[in-house]
UniProtKB/Swiss-Prot annotation:
Functional description taken from the UniProt entry: Toxic component of one of 6 LXG toxin-immunity modules in this strain. They promote kin selection, mediate competition in biofilms, and drive spatial segregation of different strains, indicating that LXG toxins may help avoid warfare between strains in biofilms. Mediates intercellular competition during biofilm formation; disruption of the operon disadvantages the bacteria, but overexpression of the cognate immunity protein restores growth in competition with wild-type. Overexpression alone in situ causes growth arrest but not cell lysis; no effect is seen on DNA or rRNA.
UniProt source species: Bacillus subtilis (strain 168)
Induction behaviour: Expressed on rich and minimal solid media likely in early stationary phase; dependent on DegSU. Not expressed in liquid LB, but only under conditions that promote biofilm formation.
InterPro entries: Bact_secretion_toxin, LXG_dom, PT-TG_dom, YwqJ_deaminase
GO cellular component: extracellular region
Knockout mutant characteristics: Deletion of the ywqH-ywqI-ywqJ-ywqK-nfi operon has no visible growth phenotype, however it is out-competed by wild-type cells.
Name of the protein described by the UniProt record: Toxin YwqJ
Top-level division of the source organism's lineage: Bacteria
Family membership: In the N-terminal section; belongs to the LXG family.
Length: 602
């Protein structure tokens, strides 16, 4: 279904609606005071049925409390809309999903056809003058990568709009239970004023009102509403602290004053962590921390980790509260790692050594000299802890960097080795760069413009499949490390696969796949151990499905592409091409496997 999203209009409407609820909230509070005034008359109001009447107005005040809970929940929901939009990275956006679903892909295809045609013409011209001057044919690598990136942005935008729409709609619909709760509660109150023949506040039975089973169910729903409001409050606080963390992250390290770091630390870690990092007191053990330890804790809080307390607090995950009618299911945790986005941590590493360097410097100072950054003596235990902390933080490369810059006189060999290695690597890289194009062409060959189109389309479809799998509810373990796609160039059909978590090949095997698994050379099968089982990987599952659909297919007509289904390591984030394992190389041999390094040409 086509959707139109405009962030500015939605946010403005939410603000307008919020003001209306705030006006209603003021009126309800006035009404509650009036009801409570009658209920609190005490001995000033006596006589036949007076106590029942006062109890009745106390019940009315309770009904108003239910209205106030409903209003507060609606205000909390409306307050969170702008944050929900930001979580999906749709700030200042206007999106028509029909355009992204249809017009834009058609435009991409047309653009690819035009670019390929132009390249063919230029290649023809360069070939015509090759006897005069030898020029390398240019490739479409950069174009393919940029088009792939653009398609990913398109898909991510559609997914973001769908997620936001579903999230807000579901959350709002769940709040309707509070509407029903108020009306039901009022109905039970009215029932409690009846004597069987007529209804009057004089006949009000407070015990009957509170013991009614329907009343008890309503109270449970209202408690969920209160929990929802608390969750939204925590959500708003988490978002505020994340913004503050990013603001702090963008400051140069030398602008992060001790007081500023203390205040920042106190806000992001909660009361206990505040006591530890800013006052130097552990509220659990009562131990007093040194000034150096407090500075270290403050710096590491700004950088994303508090060494005194570790990863502390409760985590607010997913950027939204989960509210379900009938169960008190609110997922709203509050933690430091929620406030530290990847971008924040990257910035917080700063220039040179930055905040991490402050801690490393103090740690090495304690280990080498037996004194902290302020010259105070530390115990043997603290010296060992300081060394371990510093080494853990900056790692082997950071260790060399630290000694190079701070202990050059005492560690000349480290500096010499580092410089010689650097010069060697630069020379090696220069030599490789001069022959890389020819090397890749010799190794991988070149692609026709038809295969270029196939590759772009296959890449897009595999990333679409990855997006679908991520939103399907499968855990990271269930979806495994890879998603593979196979394009049958003859039929234009796509087939997909993920790893079998039990390490088993497909239950129904194409004869070719079966033979290759069974007849795999022993040294190959036993020589590769980083697998749960030969034939269980994503590309084998996808290829097997394609062959089952067209058993007599020529393997050269089957194009295979594999990407990471999650972040494997720093060099292999989610969604990047993956190499095949030795088992899969053997099983999928002779297919049209597309490595990312492949160069295109005539």
């Amino acid at each position: 279904m086509s959707k139109v999203f405009e962030s500015k209009s939605l946010i403005e409407e939410a603000k307008s609606r919020k003001k209306q609820y705030e006006t209603l909230e003021e009126q309800l509070n006035t009404l509650k005071k009036a009801f409570q005034g009658v209920a609190d008359l005490g001995d000033n109001f006596k006589g036949n049925g007076a106590d029942n009447i006062k109890d009745f107005f106390q019940g009315q005040a309770e009904i108003v409390d239910s209205w106030l809970t409903l209003v507060s929940a609606q205000i909390a929901f409306l307050n969170g809309i702008s944050g929900d939009i930001k979580d999906q990275e749709l700030n200042d956006s206007y999106v028509e999903t029909s355009f992204l679903d249809h017009e834009l892909p058609n435009g991409d295809l047309k653009a690819s056809e035009i670019v390929s045609a132009h390249k063919e013409e230029i290649d023809s011209i360069l070939s015509g003058i090759s006897d005069i001057i030898d020029l390398d044919m240019y490739t479409l690598d950069d174009y393919a990568d940029k088009m792939g990136d653009a398609q990913k942005i398109r898909r991510d935008t559609i997914t973001a709009v769908d997620k936001l729409d579903e999230s807000l709609t579901t959350e709002y619909q769940n709040l309707e239970s509070l509407d029903n709760a108020v009306l039901t509660k009022y109905s039970v109150l009215m029932q409690a004023t009846s004597n069987g023949k007529s209804a009057s506040p004089m006949y009000y039975d407070k015990k009957a009102f509170h013991s009614n089973e329907v009343y008890k169910s309503v109270i449970e729903v209202e408690n969920q509403g209160t929990t929802y409001i608390d969750a939204k409050t925590q959500q708003a606080e988490a978002r505020r602290l994340q913004e503050k963390a990013e603001e702090e992250a963008n400051k140069p390290w030398y602008e992060k004053t001790w007081d500023g770091v203390c205040n920042f630390t106190g806000e992001v870690t909660g009361y206990y962590d505040y006591k530890r990092a800013t006052e130097g007191v552990d509220p659990v053990t009562g131990e007093k921390l040194s000034t150096a330890e407090r500075v270290t804790a403050g710096a590491m809080a700004a950088a994303g980790f508090i060494p005194v307390v570790g990863w502390a607090g409760r985590a607010f995950k997913g950027g939204k509260a989960i509210y379900k009618t009938g169960k008190a299911a609110i997922a709203a945790e509050h933690a430091l790692d929620a406030y530290k986005t990847g971008k924040s941590l990257d910035i917080l590493k700063m220039t040179e050594m930055g905040a991490y360097g402050l801690v490393a410097s103090n740690g090495f100072s304690e280990a080498v000299t037996g004194r902290d950054m302020f010259g105070n003596k530390v115990s043997e235990e603290k010296r060992k802890q300081g060394a371990l902390e510093a080494i853990t933080i900056i790692g082997g490369a950071g260790l060399a960097h630290y000694f190079d810059r701070l202990y050059q006189k005492n560690a000349p060999y480290v500096n010499k080795v580092s410089n010689e290695s650097l010069i060697s690597n630069i020379a090696k890289t220069t030599e490789e760069k001069q022959t890389r194009l020819q090397y890749l062409r010799n190794k991988h060959g070149v692609l026709s413009k038809e295969d270029l189109h196939h590759r772009i389309n296959l890449r897009a479809e595999v990333l679409n499949e990855l997006s679908r799998i991520k939103s399907s509810g499968l855990t990271k373990k269930q979806r495994g490390p890879a998603v593979a796609g196979v394009l049958d160039k003859k039929t234009g059909n796509y087939y997909f696969g993920i790893n079998n978590i039990d390490g088993k090949p497909p239950k129904v095997l194409h004869p070719l796949i079966h033979d290759r698994i069974v007849n795999m050379p022993t040294e190959l099968k036993e020589g590769y151990i980083k697998t749960s089982g030969a034939g269980s990987h994503a590309e084998v599952n996808a290829l097997n499905e394609a062959l089952l659909q067209r058993p007599d297919a020529d393997l050269k007509d089957l194009m295979v592409y594999v990407v990471s289904a999650r972040k494997i390591n720093k060099k292999m984030p989610e969604g990047v091409p993956m190499p095949r394992c030795p088992h899969c190389e053997y099983i999928t041999q002779n297919t049209n496997y597309i490595p990312e390094a492949l160069k295109y040409g005539k």
